[in-house]
Structure formats: structure tokens, C-alpha cells
Regions:
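Long, contiguous binding/interaction regions
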Residues: 1-183
Length: 183
């Protein structure tokens, strides 16, 4: 079972037929394969990861957020990573691609646009770091710093309770450290 990456994709194209094609492929769950087709009839892990940037195709009818003649906005989950390699191919086909992504299990997020992939490793960040270092659009879209702050508070509560339970169980005197303590 993969870790799922949350994605939002905004596609624009001068040709309305390309937008319709993208919408229809997304609704079928064959979005990437429509524009970057797999060779042969068999699925190939290495080929998909190399040419799509992710293990499996994406899309379903539920994830279509909005569509106009020249724009399609969708959201979807992808296996392990965003389909950045597919985005590059879409740009070659005349699409303008703007995508955001967040993978909470592996602690990364990013924005992909015409300048490439702006990737953020969150693994050594706390909620304050995320608020300061991530673009606010990305943080707000996925609620990253808010989720991290909730986790930090829950974790602190668990550690505090664990300490209190241990002191009580062993009959020791509680030791209170100040915030300025180096101990």
C-alpha cells in the first residue's frame, strides 16, 4: 500500500479540445496514460515511475473541480509522489501546468509550474518552520502547519502524561525543568 500524495492540478490550453480530452481522460481514471501512453499493453513499474513520476495513473470523476473552455482544475491522490514527469510532457503538448502537492507520511510538499518543481522537505520542520518557510498558499491549501501544530500539542500532552505516570508509578519526586534549563 503506497503513501498517497495529495495533488491539485490547474491545466490551461489554447485549444478547448485539449481541455475536453484531459477532462474525459481524468474522468476515466486514465489521465496520465492519455498524454504519456505506456508502451505495450502491460503495466511496467519502472517505466511509469520514470515517465510519469508516479506508480499508477490518476483521476476519477469525483476529482473534477472546475472546467471552462481553456481551463481544467482537478484534485487527486497519486502513489508515493506527484506526477512531475507527466507535467513536463503536458507542457510539451502546449498545456500550462500549475500544480501543488503534499505527502504527509513522507513529509514533503511542493509547487510545480512553468519554472519547474519547487520541492520542500518538511521532515526536519516543526509547525513554526512550515509557517515561515513554505509559501502560504501551499500551507493553507493543505493545512500543513495547522496539522503539525495539532500533532505537536498531542505529542507534548502524551509525553507529559507518560512522565507523570512514571513518577507516580515509581514513587519518585517530580522534577520540574525550566524552559531555560540545559538538562
Amino acid at each position: 500500500m503506497p503513501n498517497w500524495t495529495n495533488n491539485t492540478l490547474n491545466l490551461t490550453h489554447e485549444d478547448p479540445e485539449m481541455i475536453v480530452r484531459a477532462r474525459d481522460a481524468f474522468a476515466r481514471g486514465e489521465f496520465i496514460n492519455e498524454f504519456v501512453p505506456t508502451p505495450g499493453s502491460e503495466w511496467n513499474y519502472e517505466w511509469c515511475v520514470s515517465n510519469w513520476g508516479t506508480k499508477w495513473d490518476v483521476g476519477d470523476n469525483q476529482g473534477i473541480n472546475s472546467i471552462t473552455d481553456h481551463e481544467l482544475v482537478v484534485y487527486f491522490d497519486s502513489a508515493w509522489s506527484p506526477p512531475v514527469a507527466a507535467y513536463e510532457r503536458l507542457q510539451d503538448l502546449g498545456f500550462t501546468v500549475y500544480a501543488t502537492y503534499y505527502e504527509p507520511g513522507m513529509c514533503f510538499a511542493g509547487i510545480y509550474d512553468e519554472h519547474g518543481d519547487n520541492y520542500f522537505d518538511l521532515s526536519n520542520m516543526d509547525s513554526g518552520d512550515v509557517q515561515q518557510q513554505l509559501p502560504s498558499e501551499l500551507d493553507e491549501m493543505y493545512g500543513i502547519s495547522e496539522s503539525m501544530a495539532e500533532y505537536e500539542a498531542e505529542n507534548q500532552d502524551e509525553v507529559t502524561q507518560w512522565y507523570k505516570d512514571g513518577v507516580e508509578a515509581t514513587g519518585l519526586e517530580p522534577h520540574i525543568l525550566s524552559k531555560d534549563s540545559n538538562v
